[in-house]
Design a protein with these regions (language model features):
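Secretory-pathway/luminal and periplasmic proteins that interact with or process carbohydrate-rich
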Residues: 8-11, 97, 163-167, 221-229, ...
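Alpha-helical scaffold segments in carbohydrate-active enzymes
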Residues: 92-95, 140, 213-220
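Extended, low-hydrophobicity, Ser/Thr/Pro/Gly-biased non-transmembrane segments
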Residues: 2-104
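A generic secondary-structure signal for well-formed alpha-helical elements
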Residues: 3-9, 65-67, 145-149, 194-198, ...
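Acidic/His/Gly-enriched intrinsically disordered linker/tail segments
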Residues: 205-207, 211-242
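Catalytic cores of transferase enzymes with a strong primary signal for eukaryotic protein kinases
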Residues: 3-5, 16, 110, 177, ...
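Juxtacatalytic substrate-recognition/specificity segment
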Residues: 59, 88, 106-206
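Short coil/turn segments at secondary-structure boundaries
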Residues: 13-16, 71-76, 104, 113, ...
Length: 242
């Protein structure tokens, strides 16, 4: 597959923001095959109008050398080519391949049970706390719903029109969020690594299996981690208000 595209200046799944570039839902994926035929659906502006099957990817990305890359897969090789860098990345059994890049990124990282957990940010006074929230969410969901299926998980601060967005092994977090909403969004988007990414669902026709289960999972997390200051009643009230 060969194609050329011009990115819009927009804070969305795919677009150029002031400090980062989002490449989400831009890469060709396998069309879902359901009930003996390929599944076709209209793109909706609300929700997550995608139905994605699993595949394995090897991606080569060439960017100006000043840019740091966060992606669905692990970087398996990195080469400097004069003023550019070439990254080779791979990911197995994922439903999509997404990338965020910026020349402003700093990276906080840790390791948990063989999983590399990374937090990419450019405007954050408490990056260690947000990295810890991602790790605690992974730990809780793994113990509650089953082991996290990948060996890397990245949370990325970026320009985005909503609170956040989920991709396999990669969560986008809006740079416009306050502290409380940032923590909530990290926990919420991390739950999507089970509900959509690991389990899979028809996000168009059965959206409750995506956002519904994710919101429920986040409520369970905060119920078991009261130090974050969220209650189930508060989360239900906020959801109903939307």
């Amino acid at each position: 597959v060969c194609f050329l595209t011009k990115l819009a200046k927009i804070n969305h799944r795919t677009g150029i923001g002031q400090k980062s570039i989002n490449l989400g839902n831009f890469y060709p994926v396998l069309c879902a095959y359901l009930d003996g035929e390929f599944y076709e659906c209209v793109y909706y502006s609300d929700g997550d109008p995608f139905v994605s099957e699993c595949a394995s990817y090897q991606v080569v990305l060439t960017v100006p050398k000043e840019y740091t890359v966060a992606a669905t897969g692990k970087v398996t090789s990195e080469k400097t080519l004069e003023s550019k860098k070439e990254y080779t990345m791979s990911a197995s059994n994922v439903r999509d391949f997404a990338i965020v890049l910026s020349d402003c990124f700093e990276v906080a990282e840790t390791k948990w049970k063989g999983v590399d957990i990374k937090y990419y940010y450019y405007n954050d006074e408490t990056p260690a706390a947000h990295l810890a929230a991602a790790q605690e969410a992974l730990e809780y969901y793994s113990a509650t719903f089953g082991a996290y299926p990948y060996d890397i998980y990245s949370v990325v601060q970026t320009g985005f029109c909503y609170g956040g967005m989920e991709f396999p092994a990669l969560s986008l977090i809006s740079d416009a969020l306050n502290e409380q909403n940032c923590v909530y969004t990290i926990v919420h988007e991390t739950a999507h690594q089970w509900w959509y990414v690991a389990v899979g669902s028809n996000q168009v026709e059965n959206a409750w299996q995506d956002e519904g289960l994710t919101e429920y999972s986040a409520a369970l997390f905060f119920e078991n981690h009261p130090d974050y200051g969220f209650t189930r009643e508060q989360l239900v009230s906020d959801a109903l208000a939307e």
